[in-house]
Amino acid sequence: MSTGFFGDIQKVKYEGPDSDSPLAFRHYNPDEIVLGKRMEDHLRFAVAYWHSFAWEGGDPFGGRTFDRPWYSNELDAAKLKADVAFEFFSLLGAPYYCFHDADVRPEGRNFAENTRYLNEIVDIFEKKQAETGVKLLWGTANLFSNRRYMGGAATNPDPDVFAFAAATVKSCIDATKRLGGENYVLWGGREGYETLLNTDLGRELDQMGRFLNLVVEYKHKIGFKGTILIEPKPQEPTKHQYDYDVATVYGFLKRYGLESEVKVNIEQGHAILAGHSFEHELALARALGIFGSIDMNRNDYQSGWDTDQFPNNVPEMALAYYQVLLAGGFTTGGTNFDAKLRRQSLDPQDLLIGHIGGMDCCARGLKAAAAMLEDGALSKPLDERYAGWNGDFGKKLLTGLSLDQITAEVETKDINPQPKSGRQEYLENVVNRYV
């Protein structure tokens, strides 16, 4: 049943590259076969509940710009928001969604009331998932917006805050499991510090390690089959966050014995904030064996902060999905649009148009990545570049020779290597030919 919020807009369909309709897909065809699999099953698109339905259009210099009928801290408003959200998922044809607890329920007076509200909304979500076929990609807890978390959640100097956060995560894992969620995400927006003058860094890291171990223990206790994911980000809102980037997260997981239990959810905008490219973070996660899922968006490259815009750069998407395909594709993960409208984009159809453009961009990137993979366009030059390591001497260097023996080989064989071209310009041109 229509809520009326989207007027007479019909379900978005694939019309092909010649379509000029802003409410149709030009490149995203869910049933198109790419590398033997449906495009929908490769991309596994999800809509972010928070940016799409909870964000009000504010910024540090001004308040709300959007006028939505569900903007109040009442249970009835949360129920209306759920109706509109699932109508949107169905219109868009998105197979998944993601949410924080605070996105979907009113803020209660205490933990018990928060949990009761969350469970009431989960009752509604269960019915709507059954009616629409839309599934939950991942759930998470908002451990950063409420003022109780201003000094962190797991890393807070007050053990009562740690306990409240832990109980909240338990309720959110329960909700995620009940809804058939395929992952559970932890993002530490307040897990870090503003100044070392009032921070015991070592203690806070140990607290965070304990917190994550509790999450993993509870996952196994209740039989939750989903993947636990950490989402790296270097700063914002905190000056320095402990989950800075993929490399930092991996070091943290290794220290606390969790590298085989937890993977990463990588956001393009966060990679940029950390001084990396998106494909760098994806490639590193793949190399370290912790690749899990992605949040798709982009940042304004001039502003220097996290703008969470919809993706529109096809070459960037091609290189990102190339790494995803090299990792074997998504298993429990997917492509969550952690992207929001610009605060002047007020109309309901703007929300559809933003997602349509992002989905088309990702589809083009996926197809380009698949073609490069099939043709060996990047892998063949890479194999040639490292071919020497497949020879006898290269293998011995990695497996058996001591430093003395290597030195003897260099002297005996008069090894005097000459540099070879890295062919970067050629490879950049190759990528552009595919997009």
Swiss-Prot record:
Needed cofactors: Mg(2+)
Taxonomic source organism: Brucella anthropi (strain ATCC 49188 / DSM 6882 / CCUG 24695 / JCM 21032 / LMG 3331 / NBRC 15819 / NCTC 12168 / Alc 37) (Ochrobactrum anthropi)
Catalysis: reaction(s): alpha-D-xylose = alpha-D-xylulofuranose
GO cellular component, as recorded: cytoplasm
GO terms of biological process kind: D-xylose metabolic process
Active-site residues, as the UniProt record annotates them: H100, D103
InterPro entries to which the protein is assigned, alphabetical: Xyl_isomerase-like_sf, Xyl_isomerase-like_TIM-brl, Xylose_isom_bac, Xylose_isomerase
Disulfide bonds: none
Protein name: Xylose isomerase
Enzyme Commission number(s) of this protein: 5.3.1.5
Subunit annotation: Homotetramer.
